[in-house]
Amino acid sequence: DMVKLYKIELLHVHYAIPHAYAGYMAKQMLKDEGIKIPMVTTLHGTDITLVGNHPFYKPAVTFSINKSDVVTSVSQSLKEDTLKLFDIKKEVVVIPNFIELDNHKIEADIPCYRSVLASENERIITHISNFRKVKRIPDVIKIFYKIQQSISAKLLMVGDGPEKERAENLCNELGIADKVIFLGNSNEIDRILSYSDLFLLPSETESFGLAAL
């Protein structure tokens, strides 16, 4: 209905599972009504290496990728993983993630906001992720534990996910709960990174590492 209402000319779906499969179904429904619309599928990482590689989902992922008109990957390594793990007949084009620099400018009021989180002599260490096991959240806490033994510092944990409670418990066990601030999900990543002194991303694996970008 959205395609017909807004006269959409292209379906660009992100993640092979479930969106590519849903996109294919929508494309077939439109085809039955005489509407032909191409579909581009962009692969991001966990849809291939984690969720998509599960035996239950693998046939559907393979099918939906092969039925896409164009397939893109956010990195060369993810492309290689895709071709290794699935029987893909389509060409996979690598188009890295990017940002628009004009939209990411440091604001003049940064010092004011920084002072709310840390004193002038404290360093700010920042981690941003979806708090899943692959992000090695306990290691982030342990790394900071060693850092704060040598220098005065605060740790900002930005994001949310299944490993958050474990991280909070570890902070309490190590006696650093007063030095770690859990900010949850935020729309002010630019501002947070602008007053950070160090960004930590010790992931087990990353298809691209969007948080680092």
Model features per residue range: what roles?
Residues L10-I35:
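An aromatic- and histidine-rich active-site surface loop
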Residues K31-T41, T46-F63:
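Nucleotide-sugar donor phosphate/pyrophosphate-binding loop at the beta->alpha transition
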